[in-house]
Amino acid sequence: MTTELCTYTRNACDIARRTGVERIELCAAPLEGGTTPSAGLIHYARSLPGLRLSVMIRPRGGDFLYTDDEVALMAEEIRLAREYGADGVVFGLLTPDGEVDETRTAQLVREAEGMEVTFHRAFDMTRDPLRALEAAVRSGCRRVLTSGGRNTAQEGIETLRALAAQAAGRIEIMAGSGVGPSNARLLAATRVDALHFSARRERESGMRFRNPRVSMGGCAGVPEYTLTDADESVVRQILAELG
């Protein structure tokens, strides 16, 4: 069972290295569900020994229906990820009707030749996950990251089981969303190939002065003084559950 830690910070990368997680998915912007990380963070993650590195390729938050210009930007980000030594890239593209965009996905898979391609949880926004799996196979993806089309992997466990059976070794199924110590073994029993988790914890900002009249994102609901990182103890508990 391969383990992958979703990482947004240098500290989370260090936790992955210390605990023995096999692969990291490197992202920015957790409140957006993950976007392309900074060059500096990619460079740092690549410097750590013993970790396989997959880089998120997502130019913005929101939906997964991209313009031609956005796809061109994603292709450039894939080229840069290769230059920095990434082992893989992570992306997902959909059609307006909720299907995998096979044409554009295959285009970016070709751009990523020599690297592993993960089709991310855009997969869970498709109309039919079993049909979407075949589209991901045809597009040349190495794996899909999925919660079984539900908010959490535990809620989607029966679909995960069906996806693992349908994949039949043609493509890897990686379960993610809400994976923790309490359900890691249960999810592993579905015969998926990998588990993806963030072991997320939040901590309060150290700022003593907080201007209540300003919201940097223009949205008062965004927790500007709450910082998100990985919790090393939770990572270790998950790994212990998996043996």
Put a short name on every predicted segment.
Residues R23-T35, L80, Y84-P96, C141-Q154, ...:
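Glycine-rich phosphate-binding active-site loops on the catalytic face of alpha/beta enzymes
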